[in-house]
């Protein structure tokens, strides 16, 4: 029973909460669709697929407007549910190739993507090295905007990357970039603190004209969205979870101040 609640019932509850809570959250959102496309950006993704789930339409909209977009994928995704017929090294290669394919569908070239290849789930163990590599990229690219996973997400890599993005902003006071966080594993009420929710400056970018291609880019992550090896115990992201990223808009939290901290890990 406990296993059922953890694997099935509670995720379904969170997905239902997203259906109800998302409109309430977005009722006070600022539509930045007309403002953001022309601005260059750096997208920081904790794992292969986060860039597409969280920012796919925004990336396409920027590229269509002629803006420069770079994507950095921080970890190798090795600890996502892995088919037993694949070794860890083979699975890492699959995930990286899927990222290249998905980003190509979004319109990015291979040169636009950087893989840092830190071990999935262990980004916090390499915080200083990750920060230094990201700082070098920021100094080289100097993007007008930075997009990163939400500091409220229920995954340590997502939070560490968000914390690093905030640290980097403080290290570059003379060359500031607007910082936006995109929620992935956000709809878990155990993570929410009223103060944090009230402090969120919520922004949206509409997906008009880009939703079909975003769906194709998500589908390129076959190891994540399908039981692509056909194994009996194969796992895939839940359809209810994926639907959150194929609605009318993409959701972002603009970081005005780095004061908000990560909630306790679950």
Where does each model-flagged region fall?
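Metal-dependent de-N-acetylase/amidase catalytic core
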Residues: 2-44, 65, 87-90, 97, ...
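ATP-dependent adenylation/pyrophosphate-handling site
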Residues: 37-48, 52-90
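Generic hydrophobic, amphipathic alpha-helix propensity
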Residues: 75, 95-99
